[in-house]
Amino acid sequence: VLFRSKTLNIHPVKAEKDDTDLALGVEQAIQKGYTEIDIYGATGGRLDHFMGTLQILFKSDYIKKEIIIKVIDKQNEIMLLNTGTHQLHKSDKYQYVSLILVNGEVILSLSGFKYNLNHQHLEIGSTLTISNEVNRSMAIIEVEKGQVLQMRSRDLE
């Protein structure tokens, strides 16, 4: 967890505990009043830890408080989109946008994309919303029902 300050207090925790180091760090950042948190270095290595990182995005307290948490690496940026309207600016860094269904059914509308959708009903297992592209200065994602993981990505050169 990266804090925007000149000093960083490190609080060691026991190796054997009921949460991951990252989950504890995110909780501490939120307790300090941060409402936007960028997480770096959490996508490589063990898949169980990566999946645990994604679970943090779904914590109901964070959703209720509208905490924005992004998981970022050299090729991707992942964040949770809940029901509502979301603006997405075209990016020179990330060419592709994928919307991953994570639970139940989703109803999506997309505008400003290469492949737009209008009140599209989707269920788990669908790959319809993989590898889209923003083709205007700003695109709109309307999550009418459900939740999706928004993944912005780029090919490595």
Spell out what each predicted region is.
Residues 61-78:
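Short, acidic/small-residue loops that bind anionic groups at enzyme active sites
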Residues 76, 81-157:
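Long, charged alpha-helical interface segments
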Residues 11-31:
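Short phosphate-binding loop-to-helix
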Residues 44-60:
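Short Gly/Thr/Asp-enriched flexible loops that form oxyanion-binding sites at enzyme active sites
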Residues 35:
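Short acidic/polar active-site loop segments enriched in Thr and Asp
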